[in-house]
UniProtKB/Swiss-Prot annotation:
Subcellular location: Cell inner membrane
Main location: membrane
Name of the protein this chain belongs to: Probable 4-amino-4-deoxy-L-arabinose-phosphoundecaprenol flippase subunit ArnF
Lineage, highest ranks first: Bacteria, Pseudomonadati, Pseudomonadota, Gammaproteobacteria, Pseudomonadales
Family: Belongs to the ArnF family.
Amino acid sequence: MSRARGFAFALGSVALVSGAQLGMRWSMTRLPAPDQWLPALSAGSVDLAALAVVAAAIAAYALSMLCWLLALRDLPLGRAYSLLSISYALVYLLAASLPLFNEPFTLSKTLGVALVILGVITINSRSAPATSPRNTP
């Protein structure tokens, strides 16, 4: 098991799922409700770029899942799972700082994100045992 490789795959999963969330948000502000996509496509009134971003976001979710599965080969679940919380912070910070999302910074959300990051650091700062009786064949 390689802890560094596990962290790299877990953080890759976080980056992909965060990008997918932002892409979905951007797209859904430019598209009709999903049940109206087919009628809108027939009428030629769908933003094809937004639809392409939805497709790319779905692909990013699939790649994120692959990275997650690879991360789980190298990291204990309790440690790896905490890393997923970084996506909440990342999505909030990017959505609030990029003007195209028009999301506000708020004190309560920012404090919540700080607590999440502090929790991730706390969980991952202790060194984990290399193996445990449950992990050995």
